[in-house]
Structures are given as C-alpha cells and as structure tokens.
Amino acid sequence: MLRVLRSFYIHFFGFLDQEEYSRKLKENLTLDVEGRPYRMLVFRGSPKSSRKSSRLIDEMRRSDEDTTNTRDSNKNRSFPKKESLVLDAPNLSDDFYMNVLDWGSGNLIAVALGSALYTWNPSNRAIHKLLDVDSQCDYPTSLAWSGDARKIAVGHMCSDVQLWDAETSKLVRSLRGHQNKVVSVEWNGHILTSGGNDKAIINHDVRAKKSLTCYLRVHTRGVCSLKWSRRSNILASGGDDNLVYIWNASKMSSSHYMYRLNAHSAAVKALAWCPYNSDVLASGGGLLDGSLKLWNVQKGVCINSINTHAQVCALQWNRHQKEILSGHGFSWGNTDCGNQLCLWKYPSMSKIGGSSKSDSRVLHLTQSPDGLRVASAGANETISIWEVFGPPQANEPRSSGLDSLLAFRASPIR
C-alpha cells in the first residue's frame, strides 16, 4: 500500500524527499477532503443524536458500575429475620383507603386507633393520647406530621381536616372543603394538601385566615394518596381510578397537570419519591394490579416495572443504600410477596429479601428521622419496628418483641 502511494505521489508531484513524502502521507490518512481530522469510531448520526448516544452510553456505564458496586456491597445483605419491636395497636382499622401512621422529625410515631390518635416515643416508650373523637360516625382516617413536628394534620371520616398542636394537645383550627372521607393529608412547608373520597385535592395555606388556595378535581374516583417531592416542589396523586397525576406547585389547576400516568390497573395508594433522584417516583398498584413501577416524572415515562402479584399498600425508600421497601396485602398466584415486606435493589428492582409472611396485610409504612428504621402497621393490629435500612447500634440493647408487646399492652392504649 505504501509503495503504491509513493508511486502515486512521484507520478503527480515528481520526486519527493522522505520528509515531504511523510507529510503528504499523513495528511491523506488523517484529514478529510475539507482538511478536517477524521473522527474514529464515532456514531455517524446528527450532532444531536450523537450527544444523546454518548449520554446514554455514559448512563449505562454508570448504571453498570452502580449495579456492580451494589452487588459487591450487598453480598451479605439480607432482610432482618425478625422485627426489633412489636407494639400492640388495638382498633387499627383494616382499611386500604386510610393513611394513619407517620414517624415525625421529632422522633414520635403518630397512629390512629379507632376514634383516638396516639403518639409513641421510641426513646422512652412514652405514650400520649392526642385526641379522641366523641362521635360514632367520625374517626381519624389520615394523618401527617408537619416538617417541624410541632403540628399534626388529621383528616376525618366526616370530611374535616384538623390541625393539632402536638405539644399542648390543643386543636389549632379546622379546615373545610371536602364532602367526604379525607383519605390522605400531606405537608409542603406551610401548604397542607388533602385528598378525599369526594375526588378532590385541596391546598390550604395554614398561615392564612382564608386558607383554601387551590381546589382540584380530576380523579374520577376517590383520591388514595398524595406525596410532595421535597426537592422539586412536585406533587403526585394516586387515585382509585387507577391513575397517577403529576402536578407542578406553581401551575396547579384542574386543567393544568404535568402528566397523567395510566399504566396501573387498580387503585394507586403507594407512592414514594426517590431520595437520590428527584425525577424518579415509585408507585404501587392495588389487588388487581400488583405492579411496582418507577417513573421519570420530567418525561412522563415508566422506566421500570415489576409484578409482585400482591396488593402494594405502601413504599419507603432507603436513604442510605439504593433500595426500596414495599409493604403488601392480598396476593394471588405463585408469589412470595403477599402480606409481607419486600426489599428491592434500585434501579434493577431485583429482590433482596423479605419478611416472613403474615396472616394479615401490611397497610402502612413510615421511617425514622435518621432513615435507619421502618415502622409497619398491619391489619393484625400491631406495629412492628424493623432495623432494615441500617445496622443496629453496637451498644444499643435490643428489646425482644415479646417484651415490647407486653409493655405496650399494659399501656393506656389498650
């Protein structure tokens, strides 16, 4: 080949010395007809598609590295063999359409049991009755701590939303607007959002005398769940119409939502925002669906989906490792997810492990302020504390489940 090129240049340019010949050879092998250097092994598409391809390859490589690192770090990762505490919770309602368990930033667990709402302190095991509804037709159906843990929002069967001072146990105010059972309440700073069986989503600015700032009605059946993204000010709502709506806080109206996600085939109660990617939302479908889905909310697309073959009642992300925990109810077919907790790797969604199967549904999940423990509430009228997201403290004594159960049964809650 080199001899042919040398003869070619001698024929057209006359005799060339060795230096000139080498220069001409280099130009013809490394430059195109316009004098620009060739780009070797690069996707030959449009500049835009080339950038996309490069980003995709980078993302795939990073995902591969993350998966490898996760696999290495999780070689000995397993689900706890048993809960660290079991608390008796008499009169905990076996109702999929309620949200009555929340672990606040002040390290108090709030739970509604029948007509009453209690707080429990994991540090000293102190129990306090915050309220008791004096009506046979009314009881708490949803609750949520404020970000500073000074107030608790309580949704009621009678359609009211109440704000309670957690320190003084005094009713601060009542907020109205719903016509039916309030299934979910969720804080976003000074904005309290509620959703009910009346299909409505309402925003209240709790600082204002006239507090109602937004009224939405797009779900064709009751609202099951509400979750605000703490980083990007986006609201996700799940409904009994099998739909998930994504809303931007600055543009909320019944005719203006970001996306309408319709991939579920049953009610969507379980919603959770990813703590390490604010664009990712996890959702879980009810009994006739059983799928756990991951969404990119900026694009409105499903990026992963698995079928658990069991009702997905609740979800919690692990803030310390790339994992997500699901709580399940009724199941069908050949599945090991029914009536138990399941831990999944993110983003592959391969199963790490799960709790022993219970005789009743896991209806609610909430995690401790440090993100190391998870509390689950079941239809068997118990609350279980799991050290599932982090290792137990080396010097912290572990109380047996039986001791905790007996101690709680001796409390005023029973």
Give residue spans per PLM region.
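Terminal intrinsically disordered, low-complexity extensions flanking WD-repeat/beta-propeller proteins
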Residues: M1-S63, T67-T70, K75, C302-C313, ...
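A short helix->beta-strand "capping" segment at the edge of beta-propeller domains
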Residues: K75-D94, N124
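A structural motif specific to WD40 beta-propellers
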Residues: S84, H128-L130, K170-R173, S211-C214, ...
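WD40/WD-repeat beta-propeller blade N-cap
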Residues: P90-D95, V133-P140, R176-V182, L216-V223, ...
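WD40/WD-repeat beta-propeller blade-loop signature
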Residues: Y97, Y139, D148, L171, ...
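Loop/turn segments within WD40 beta-propeller blades
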Residues: V100-G106, L143-A149, G155, V185-I191, ...
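Conserved strand-to-loop turn within each blade of WD40 beta-propeller repeats
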Residues: A112-G114, G155-C158, G195-D198, R231, ...
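WD40-repeat beta-propellers
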Residues: L117-P122, G155, V161-D165, V185, ...
